[in-house]
């Protein structure tokens, strides 16, 4: 797209579509998809709800001083919180973590 508010566009509709096209696990990267750390957790939750089999994201203990991808990196504490939320969400949408 030509959207400039985020780094890229995370097409959540592609997750269930890909599930019909492949036997392979679908892994979503909300860090690079958005380029903004404050969006990572909500996009990770949306991806799991849409059927993603896994999440990969940038984690850094000091994102402001990361050599690369700092703007999209979450802290270990944020990652821990996100994983707690994902563990609560997963069974609600019929998924396991």
Enumerate the predicted regions with their spans.
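C-terminal helical cap(s) of enzyme catalytic domains, especially alpha/beta-barrels
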Residues: 61-95
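Catalytic alpha/beta core domains of metabolic enzymes, predominantly
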Residues: 1-59
